[in-house]
Amino acid sequence: MNPTEIFNLLVTFKGHKTSSAGEELLGIEEIELTLQDEKNIFDIKETEFQNVVLIESGSDPLVVAKELADASTTVISKIVPIELVIRTRPDLIAEKVITISKDKIKSGETFVVRGDIRGREYIKSKEKFLSSISQEITEKLGVEMEKNSPDWVIQIEVVGENTGLSVLKPENIIKKF
């Protein structure tokens, strides 16, 4: 994967992270079948991480995520629309999260920071990292963190040297089981 890969959706599949069973191939096929109509121009990119693919879509990622959520699929597990892709550097991630959060999260609203770290050479401790981002947002934007029912979810998806960032309403991060 190249630094600063272009993508606006991250999709994970059910299955073991170390398994090379057919979940990833089946998942890619499910995405292709769901998005095959002429209005969707997209590119599915495999990653070095098992059961994780990136999608670059010419359509609104929120709309594409909903299409995938509504489709009858068997292995798609999580669908995350991505607003911004940057290189994986903790200081840059914090800076960009603040930038995109301040335009969305208003005074009196709440947030939670969630994410997955794939590739530990960039960020050693997921818990420490997400906690430090939460603290920085609270201090710089003057908004409260709420884990259980936040108004906004700040989603940080580290995929090796690339990180996808989003500030989304909770219902826009789709988990299928």
Task: Label every PLM stretch briefly.
Residues M1-F177:
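SAM-dependent transferase fold signal centered on methyltransferase-like domains
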